[in-house]
Swiss-Prot record:
Cofactors demanded by this protein: a divalent metal cation
Annotated InterPro entries: ATP-NAD_kinase_N, ATP-NAD_kinase_PpnK-typ_C, NAD/diacylglycerol_kinase_sf, NADK
The enzyme's E.C. designation: 2.7.1.23
GO biological process, any: NAD metabolic process
SUPFAM superfamilies: NAD kinase/diacylglycerol kinase-like (SSF111331)
Natural source organism: Xanthomonas campestris pv. campestris (strain ATCC 33913 / DSM 3586 / NCPPB 528 / LMG 568 / P 25)
Protein name in UniProt: NAD kinase
Length: 258
């Protein structure tokens, strides 16, 4: 990082984020994304995920500041003439690899997407989903009955995955969480921790009577018949965090929250 980094400021449409961006641009200037050294994202976790999806391929480190309802992936926003440049110089990086999802639908079309938090399959109607679970080409569960199932990254393991009673994964552990959502059968199965290079394939066993949708972060595809998930080997993003509250510490602390 250069001594005076060029910053591209991005803000969610929320009024506090827009106002904060205006103040920061006046103080530090603003650069186009392709000219910037760092991206500063102002908003909540939803906007951070949107920023990573839209601009992750640009390979720019992202420093987020919380101006939204949820900010697990963000640093605190401070507007008391805080020296942002000093914070950026001290910031610690966290490297994240997204999940790659490939979907086949009932109509025969295929689609793909990335997920930095999780890929989740959910029943579309009142009827439970019936799914099979294959890992690296081997069927591990012939029939999973329940509301659905998900695969979560370490960064996403504290979100939907944790609410579904999945494990919290340490950052840098090179693991994924495979977590059922309200499982009925097998009733005692509570999920698994997988190596990050595991290929996970879900098949919908009765897609006409029991339709299923899949969501990669916020991108939903309905009426799926097969979903394949693996960690990306090509895409990697870097988030920057204040050293006193870095992402690794946040994930660790979540395990002791009461």
């Amino acid at each position: 990082m250069t001594a005076m980094p060029r910053i591209a400021f991005l803000a969610s449409p929320a009024e506090p984020a827009v106002a904060a961006r205006a103040r920061l641009v006046q103080r530090y200037g603003d650069h186009a994304l392709h000219d910037a050294d760092i991206v500063c994202a102002l908003g909540g976790d939803g906007f951070m995920l949107q920023t990573l999806h839209r601009h992750g391929a640009a390979d720019k480190p992202v420093f987020g500041m919380k101006l939204g309802s949820v900010g697990f992936l963000m640093n605190q926003y401070r507007d008391d003439e805080d020296d942002l440049l000093a914070r950026l110089q001290r910031a610690e990086p966290a490297h994240l690899r997204p999940l790659e999802m490939l979907v086949q639908t009932e109509s025969g079309t295929s689609a793909g997407s990335l997920a930095y938090n999780e890929v989740s399959l959910l029943r579309q109607t009142r009827q439970a989903a019936h799914l099979s679970v294959d890992l690296n080409g081997q069927t591990r569960i012939a029939e999973l009955i329940g509301d659905g199932v998900m695969v979560a990254t370490p960064a996403g393991s504290t979100a939907y995955n944790y609410s579904a009673h999945g494990p919290i994964l340490p950052l840098g552990s090179h693991t994924l969480a495979l977590t059922p959502i309200a499982p009925y059968r097998p009733r005692r199965w509570r999920g698994a921790i997988l190596k990050a290079d595991t290929e996970v394939r879900f098949r919908v066993l009765d897609p006409y009577k029991r339709p299923v949708s899949v969501t990669a972060d916020s991108h939903e595809i309905r009426d799926v018949v097969e979903v394949t998930i693996r960690e990306s080997t090509e895409r990697r993003v870097t988030l920057l965090f204040d050293p006193e509250h870095n992402l690794e510490e946040r994930i660790f602390s979540e395990q002791f929250a009461v």
